[in-house]
Regions:
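Aromatic-rich, lipid-facing transmembrane alpha helices and their immediate juxtamembrane interface loops
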Residues: 1-138
Length: 138
């Protein structure tokens, strides 16, 4: 029961933050971005289940960037291409793939993943008695 509550809380936190970032960046968002944000936040947090805190932060950020970019690509293919919802279209940006992901946003996700990693770690520590976070920079 506690594990279910933990994942619901982390999902809601990530979903709300992702949705808010979209509102601040683009001026609008779509409900699917709430869902995508929640899933990404949980996946970012699960990296500590497979890799230790001894992994340098920049590597955690790199893994998180790959997760977010991959999830954005999958969501874009399903929502924008298959279902035709046209929630976003990066076709006019350089280094895009199918108009769904682009290098410049992947770089942005690298930097935005740092506060997400730290927030997830501390939420798990404060609320669920998980290991106290500690980090290596290099």
């Amino acid at each position: 029961m506690i594990k279910t509550f933990k994942f619901i809380l982390l999902f809601l936190t990530g979903g709300n933050l992702y949705y808010l970032i979209e509102i601040l960046w683009r001026g609008h968002s779509h409900f699917s971005m709430f869902i995508l944000g929640g899933i990404c936040f949980i996946l970012i947090g699960l990296t500590n289940e497979y890799f230790s805190f001894e992994m340098p932060l920049w590597k955690q950020q790199l893994i998180s960037t790959v997760i977010i970019t991959f999830m954005e690509l999958i969501a874009g293919i399903i929502l924008n291409i298959w279902l035709g919802l046209n929630i976003w279209d990066y076709s006019n940006l350089k280094c895009n793939l199918l108009g769904q992901i682009t290098l410049q946003y992947s770089i942005l996700w690298f930097f935005l993943s740092l506060p997400a990693i730290i927030l997830d770690d501390y939420l798990r520590y404060w609320l669920f008695d998980e290991e106290k976070p500690h980090y290596r920079c290099l």
